[in-house]
């Protein structure tokens, strides 16, 4: 079974007022823990789980990372909120460092205005050949993951009308978005090298494809999602992502070609996902026709169900998806919080509360659906091969 892990980016807010606080560097210096790192702006903080094979181990680690981040932030008078953009106005303070200085110099307002928080899922692959085959086959499904994660309706005090405005703000980077089919690892690396030779990206880390080969670990890194307000939703997206990767790898080994969906169509699907989330109609990844968002999410589940069943994760994935479809995404929760008094501070305080709800791995309502815990991988170090 393939290892997988989650990186989450959080907004740092004042523990009293809820306003964004530029204390990212202070939080990292307080922690002495490599699971916490700085982001482009001081108002952000990133966490990273270890790689795991068992979903319950991943959920426990994710909960520990959120707790670690919030407890450390409290030492400097801040809290962490799983908000993909800031509901309240923010004048970002850049993180110090030569790389960040170069990014700001090159990209101007696009960089200095980029207070956006995403969720990245890593899934182990055997080698670059398998990884690129996976990238080619998962691309039409990625907008569905975005729709399931949508958690950024507000931007600097304004209602954007989007379920994920982060996806719009992030799309201003020239290296961001969906890619054409690569076909081979050689073509993938040639494409990346050609982009670097334009002197637009600062380095490999700025190859912001929706999904890419990670340049440090033997993983496919899926980067399309908002940070999820609910930790359960992050676990669901990780499960679906691993299911997509394994399904794609099996198709490649069986000689099944990727769907030749035009990149422009994938981009339209991503726009719909960001605009409406799970509250409207999405483009079906196979037919590219608008369909009910819930039906499209179920189509994704059906696509990866054989793999989930083989891995013993089908019931927990189905339970998590049912929960999400019933209560809505973080975007819906944010809008509900604002509707009470029309005060964006309520959105932030509710996000802080939900972000830091106590979790014990897979939450109680899903444990009946989850398979029995398999052997522990607590001592597993480093990214393993599948």
Residue ranges and their predicted role:
Residues 94-96:
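Surface-exposed, active-site-proximal loop segments in enzymatic domains
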